Each structure stands twice: as structure tokens, then as C-alpha cells.
Curated annotation (Swiss-Prot):
GO biological process, any: proline biosynthetic process
Further remarks about this protein from its record: Present with 6920 molecules/cell in log phase SD medium.
Protein name: Gamma-glutamyl phosphate reductase
Similarity comment: family membership: Belongs to the gamma-glutamyl phosphate reductase family.
Annotated pathway: Amino-acid biosynthesis; L-proline biosynthesis; L-glutamate 5-semialdehyde from L-glutamate: step 2/2
GO molecular function, a single term: NADP binding
Function recorded in the entry: Catalyzes the NADPH dependent reduction of L-gamma-glutamyl 5-phosphate into L-glutamate 5-semialdehyde and phosphate. The product spontaneously undergoes cyclization to form 1-pyrroline-5-carboxylate.
Amino acid sequence: MSSSQQIAKNARKAGNILKTISNEGRSDILYKIHDALKANAHAIEEANKIDLAVAKETGLADSLLKRLDLFKGDKFEVMLQGIKDVAELEDPVGKVKMARELDDGLTLYQVTAPVGVLLVIFESRPEVIANITALSIKSGNAAILKGGKESVNTFREMAKIVNDTIAQFQSETGVPVGSVQLIETRQDVSDLLDQDEYIDLVVPRGSNALVRKIKDTTKIPVLGHADGICSIYLDEDADLIKAKRISLDAKTNYPAGCNAMETLLINPKFSKWWEVLENLTLEGGVTIHATKDLKTAYFDKLNELGKLTEAIQCKTVDADEEQDFDKEFLSLDLAAKFVTSTESAIQHINTHSSRHTDAIVTENKANAEKFMKGVDSSGVYWNASTRFADGFRYGFGAEVGISTSKIHARGPVGLDGLVSYQYQIRGDGQVASDYLGAGGNKAFVHKDLDIKTVTL
């Protein structure tokens, strides 16, 4: 048996045990993992500093450096809080979603159940190990994790803490060793992608190239998105203050995020639209990749107002219309163009977006509703920043990733996206041959029951 097959088999074995553990046991180990990571914050930070130093020496892109830095701002604290938030969420396993009486003493239930074994592959985001550990254990799934080489030292340190904690408290919580396994080599990943007998779902978190490569090389279902090309449309009835604040936040709050705005669509009838572009550059340092008609109108208006500065001119460049509207910049750059209507904005987004998250800024409810129904993305917002597309902000505690698929899970994937369901029938000796359709003459009752009153 190959090492990858053994890893996958061990995960399946652990998952079969984990799904039978009580919610109390699964939540308890998460609190203990939280405490252990917090207690070892210094060791984790030192490991992270090593990764950052190596990354800078090798010329890692700024967007990836920002993702790699686990102690930038409150990222580490948010990660820890996410573990506690997941622990405190309602148990996603064993929830009755449907109950139907088939006959007297014969009842059908649709009950949530873990997916099984997750293979999660991520690049330069060391906090993912904590997020996935929390979500997988809480949802009764075993997880195999592969971090990027950029975060290898942070990854190892955190993995050791997580696994030592699970082992230390196995007899107390019931959560088995093997519930979370860590792998390091690309060969392990390639081999594991062939283990469709044991692995139920692959979750890639990283670059477009990573996600597409995985989708092309495995039979295992893949949950994820390939790009984060998020657009904001400024309608003719947009509020200027809202437009400026939302656009600035969506682009500059965290440019390397997959939920950052990459495209700004502007209705030319929107009063003082140029102030939004001006604000993005002067307040946010954003470079505007503008279409020729937009750039001309922008410069003409600022020149008329005596506000066309050298800084504005340097930070406004010609858009490559063949590429820029299909591009995830992950930097302080965005593509901008005029669109003449809500319908035109919808058409542009559905043609160029990655179906991640898109927003409209308007005070016109009819236009907002048209936009939200017409845009084919996992998240569609009205008068809110695309940066809200996040499991933590949705109250999911954390997220496995963001799915742009329309099947199973869509948008930020939290606990609910990591459970499937099974059908359970609870009877009293009934056999199918007694009923119509199988040789008998008994009819089914097919009476739906109120799931709020059902106790299994």
C-alpha cells in the first residue's frame, strides 16, 4: 500500500469514528486547540517570521506576502476567534431536514451527515489550517491538509500543536488521532488526488492555476473558485457618499483578497461619478485602468474643475480591454469603464466575472432588484462592499473557501457546506411487497410531519 493510500485510508477510518462523536466532544477539542494555539503564539510567530524572510528573499509577490503574514494586524486573533465561533455553532450533524410518514409506524427522515474525508490544498495562507481543522471536526469530517511551500514552517508548527492536542485529549473527547493529517510534498498531493475510494471532496484554496490544475487531474468532486473577479456597478441613482466609501473599502481594505473589487462599472448619468475615481486614487493609491472614453471624460471633467493633477494622471492608465476586465489584479489596481444601464452592467458581469461576488450601488430599488436577480454570482450585494463575502463575516465562524459552483455549496462555505444528507427509514417490520408498486395493495400515506416536533 502506498503512503498516500495509507494516509487516505487512515483519514477514512478516523472520519468513520468522528461522525459518531457527540457534538460536545467535537466542540470540546476545538476549545482545547484554540487554547493550545494561543498559548504557543510566540513559537508560531517565530516560524512565520522565517517563512516571511525566505519569501522576501525569493521575491514572492506582495499579494502573497500579505496572505502569508499571520500576525499582520489582528489576523491571528481573528483566526483564534474563528475556532471558538465554530465550536459554539449549532451541531450541523444529525439535523432533520424533512420527515414524512409513509405509513403507520413507517417514517422517512432526511438527516444531515458528514461528507466524509476532505483534502484541502492551500497556498501561503497559514491560518487555513486552523479554519479547516475547526470546520472539519465540528462537521464530523476528517481532513488531509497540504499547505504551500511558502508557509511550510508556520504550517509545521501549527500542525504539531493541533495534532499533539488531539492526541493528548483523545480519551477525553473521543476525537481520534488521524482526524486531521498534514502532508508536505507535491507528490503526496498528486497521489492523493487518485484516492477517490477514500477521499470525498477536494477543496483547493489558492491561485487560478492551482484550482484549474486540480479540477483537471482528479475524479474527486472539487469545491472552490478559480478567480475572484468582483465588480461594483455605480448606478445613475447611486448615493455619492456610499459609492465612495464602498468602492474604497472594496478595493483597498485588503487588495489581495479574493473578495476585493477588481472592476468598477460606472453609469455616466451618475452625478459626480468622477469623484469616486478621484477618491480611489488620492485616498487609496489605486491605479485606474480606464477605457479610452472613460479616461477622456474623467480628465476633461477634472481639467474643467481645475483638479487634474499629475498624481491623477500618473495613476490613470489605458485599460487593456482584451485582458483587464478578465483579470484578478490582487493589488491596488482596478479596471473601470462606462456602462449605460443596469442591463448593460449585468451583461458585462455575467460575461467577465468569476461568479464570486458583485455589487450595485443605487437608491433605486427596482434597479437593485433587477441587478440582484440578473447577476449569476454566488454573492450579489446592494449598497455593500464585496469584502463582506467571507464566512467569518457571515457568522459561519470560519470558511473552507468560497464556492462559485451551483451544485451542493455556493458562496462562503461553512459548516452547512461540509454536510450532505442521508435518508433514514424507521419502521416496525414493514416490507415493500405489501405495498402498491411492489406486488401488494397497501397505499402509502405520504404525510409530511413538522420537523420542529421531530425527535430522533
